[in-house]
Amino acid sequence: MIRDVYLSDVTLRDGMHAVRHQYSIEQVAMIATALDRAGVDSIEVAHGDGLAGGTCNYGFGAHTDLEWIETVATAVKRARVATLVLPGVGTVRDLRDARRAGATVVRVGTHCTEADISAEHITAARELGMDTVGFLMMSHMSSPSALAAQAKLMEGYGATCVYVVDSGGAMVMRDVAERVDALRQTLLPATEIGIHAHHNLSLGVANSITAVQHGAHRVDASLAGMGAGAGNAPLEVFVAAAERLDWTHGCDLHALQDAADDLVRPLQDRPVRVDRETLTLGYAGVYSSFLRHAEAAAARYHIDARTLLEEAGRRGMVGGQEDMLVDIALDLTGADRS
């Protein structure tokens, strides 16, 4: 049976941001097992910034990507193992290693205006026989027509699904509808569309529902919303809403609720929620993974994290520029750079 939605869990990849990329092997195994039993279609696992994302800038992981991937591949019986690669961070060699470790799905992520740098990775993924997905991050920064043109490039390179990715949790339902509509009108009928929402404006579930209503099939979500910023669309909440809409999804709602409350929430050293800092991410349109970096810079330079994030939004900063938050703090406080 073809279901109304394909549920792509991101607890073990985007959720890495919420634990500073410090999931243990035992935690990954337990969460993956619970997700598999609950019925999700795929489980994405990697450093929060994708394959090879462990750096001085992003933060190092407690384990390697391959160790995490192998753990999930061993734990699951039916769900597909997915991973993320960002060209310029992860290489084709990293992708090949991930495939050997057990990943069969890969999302190739670029900034929403830079799809052209995904060609090599998408081509390689297809050659490896992987389910290959284009992932257009910070989609709110492109107009619907411009985003659709970038999606068409990814489709041309070989992607069989392309995502609208609200990395900043900055979009409202109208924004999502316009972008999904534009992709659906531009891409081949056989090319699927996905939605990756963040909850910074408390619209993660609403935006995901809107995307499906406008033609998206794949939906990213995470247990207890575990993810950068205020988190992703909470998986258990989305599934409950899907039930109310009579959508077929293949998941056990109670099992998802139990996994969220018993396995994931206890791991949060900072609550994944909408608060003054995470709300500012969405309001200012800033990449959600900036949260921890902004809080660290704010503490060091005695400045409100919201002020840093609002200025980052004004400057149009994107993923990978987290270190520039220190520059902003120095500019705003007049501190000595020496």
Swiss-Prot record:
One of its GO terms (biological process) is L-leucine biosynthetic process. Its EC number is 4.1.3.39. Belongs to the 4-hydroxy-2-oxovalerate aldolase family. Residues 5-257 form the Pyruvate carboxyltransferase domain. It is an enzyme of class 4 (lyase). Substrate binds at R13, D14, S167, H196, Y287. It comes from Mycolicibacterium vanbaalenii (strain DSM 7251 / JCM 13017 / BCRC 16820 / KCTC 9966 / NRRL B-24157 / PYR-1). Keywords: Aromatic hydrocarbons catabolism, Lyase, Manganese, Metal-binding. One of its GO terms (molecular function) is manganese ion binding. It catalyses: (S)-4-hydroxy-2-oxopentanoate = acetaldehyde + pyruvate. The active site is at H17. This is 4-hydroxy-2-oxovalerate aldolase 1. SUPFAM superfamilies: Aldolase (SSF51569), post-HMGL domain-like (SSF89000). The keyword Hydrolase does not apply. The keyword Metal-binding applies. The record marks R13 as: Transition state stabilizer.
